[in-house]
Amino acid sequence: MYIEKLTIKNFRAFDEDGITLQFNKGVNAIIGENNSGKSAVMDAIRIAFSTVTYKKDIFFTRADFHVSEDGNAADFALFDIYLEEVPTRLVEIWNPESVGGQGGEFHIRFERVIAANGIEKVRAIHWGIGTEGNPLSSDTFDAMDVMFLGALRDSENEMKPARNSKLAQLLRSLVPDEVTRAELVDILNSANKTLLEKEELKKTRKTINDNLARIEQDFLSQHVDIGLIEPRFDSIASSLRAWVKPKWILVSISDGEYSRAQQYAREHEDNRKIQQNEKGIYFETSILENVEDMAPELVTRINEIASSSFELYQNGLGYNNLLFMSTVLGDMAIERGGVYQHLLLIEEPEAHLHPQLQELVHTFLSDTNQGDANIQIIFTSHSPTLASKVDIGNINLIYENAHKKYCLPF
């Protein structure tokens, strides 16, 4: 299921005539000059798909009503979303009379209302096929998975250990069955047990509990245990963190394994994953994926050196953005029962990326969609490199003429 058409009226920069954008399956781009309304389109989609309360991460406010050039604010705003390849089970939005019988639609109207206490508020009315006012249920929106990556995304913080981090979400999606989750908890229990056998840990636990007993006396009599993390699957997911492995490692001329490294380099002089200079011999860490003919001592040494890493904050912003996008797309590509639409919204995916990497990003996004045709990607961009890679029929140009906003689908 994917968005085929979107109409926006009286929302921010868009007046009562509004604009209409056309989308296709796969990768779509929205382009236009600064302040043309690209971000407003993305926010309109986010608001539309977070209609049910528990899915809201963005809200429509009174400031979102369009204000005309004469200073008058609109009394209503309207979003019309038209979909294709809608399953028949989504009866609230499926339109059996559409071309091909697979179309669907839903609508959200926002109105200014005066509450009984005289305060102006915003009322939202949403409906699917049929009469305005027939509300949509949460079941319909549960079938739609929408993810947004903003232009000012903080990839470093998003990847930090937390209950709702992207890494935690990915692990929960990859390990849905309780048997495997229990196996992971058993491994953690074993690690905790081994750790607590160390005398230093025993002393730490005893010190805490002795002091606690002195404070509590006979009132609470609580006892504290310590370990790596609480032995529960959610704790494992919440504690996951990402760090960056070095691409190249150096076995220096003063290293005890230098002679073996030198011999291996001579035997594999055509291997581009091995380089040599006056400092020693460099190995690309990916060489460890196939080292059947490498001396075990050298393998061990390369692994020791490669075990060094650095935190994400020490990494470049561009590469952190790539890591973040990879994690999000990995989670979205996992098949889930009852989910028929995966929509990824990205503002300026070119942020902090060299043009060559921008090309790789587009290739990655396109390949991801081909692997799972159920993922639709819509991004905004100022990058000629990215825009030139998108099919001409998948580009929407937003522009202004004679004080009005227009959208030109190519």
Residue spans for each PLM region:
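Switch/communication elements of ASCE P-loop NTPase nucleotide-binding domains
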Residues: 1-50, 243, 249-410
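Conserved P-loop NTP-binding catalytic core
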Residues: 42-102
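Short alpha-helical segments and helix-capping/turn motifs at coil-helix boundaries
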Residues: 62-66, 94-95, 129-135, 210, ...
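Electropositive, glycine-dotted interaction segments
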Residues: 78-80, 86-193, 202-203
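Flexible glycine-/small-residue-rich
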Residues: 81-85, 150-153, 228-230, 244-246, ...
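Glycine-rich phosphate-binding loops of nucleotide-dependent enzymes
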Residues: 175-185, 192, 209-213, 225-233, ...
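Amphipathic alpha-helical domain-onset/packing element
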Residues: 196-237, 261-286
